[in-house]
């Protein structure tokens, strides 16, 4: 998917890229590849692949479920790495208030420099483990929408993300092709954490065989105070 096809595909979903937005994606690609030479951000560096597997993949929830992204909503992206999915979404929807949580300072340094080059405001970068941030009253149950892409299996991911979503908010997981198995394993975790799966959708990225599953979870009850557990525990002992 080259930049022109990317823009053309978005326009079919009523997202007409402005010249500024087109340039922001071009700069994002160039900076990603440049910094990736000395900081491990991604194994994908070919332009067509970055536009498909990073940029387009990140915005698919916004294209398919625009109603989930309310005007001015507060979005938290857990383990965003090089900014996926939240920054491509933010480029398309500058009104969103975005908080990015990541445990690696080098990645956050990249994002800080990138945001300056892109001229993007309204993004808060938080250095820390999701388990610790989820217990911090400044962030706990403060977000309308919490996103995560390819961070951990669903049972673990739920404990990272659901404590950050406010009651009535949503948790959106961007998963691979085998999400059904993960969801089965995560039933107990979701119940304990106050989440309820409302929708899953399997898609294939355009012009490829890349299968993705989007999982939308409603935060129906407050998360008990003991969750998330101590850093490292969710991964070692999933709920």
Swiss-Prot record:
Q: What is its EC number?
A: 2.1.1.-
Q: Name one GO cellular component term.
A: cytosol
* Gene3D superfamilies reported in the protein's UniProt record: Vaccinia Virus protein VP39
Family annotation (SUPFAM superfamilies)? S-adenosyl-L-methionine-dependent methyltransferases
Please list the coiled coil stretches.
none
Residues the entry annotates as binding S-adenosyl-L-methionine? 79, 84, 130-131, 149
Question: Which GO molecular function terms does the record list?
Answer: rRNA (guanine-N7-)-methyltransferase activity
Supply the alphabetized keyword list: Cytoplasm, Methyltransferase, rRNA processing, S-adenosyl-L-methionine, Transferase
Any idea where this protein resides?
Cytoplasm
Top-rank EC class of the record's enzyme: transferase
Per the record, the domain of life is: Bacteria
Under the heading InterPro entries, the entry gives: rRNA_ssu_MeTfrase_G, SAM-dependent_MTases_sf
* Transferase as UniProt keyword: yes
Q: Could you say which protein family the record assigns here?
A: Belongs to the methyltransferase superfamily. RNA methyltransferase RsmG family.
Q: What does this protein do?
A: Specifically methylates the N7 position of a guanine in 16S rRNA.
Q: What is this protein called?
A: Ribosomal RNA small subunit methyltransferase G
Q: Lineage, please?
A: Bacteria, Bacillati, Bacillota, Bacilli, Lactobacillales
Which gene name belongs to this protein? Answer: rsmG
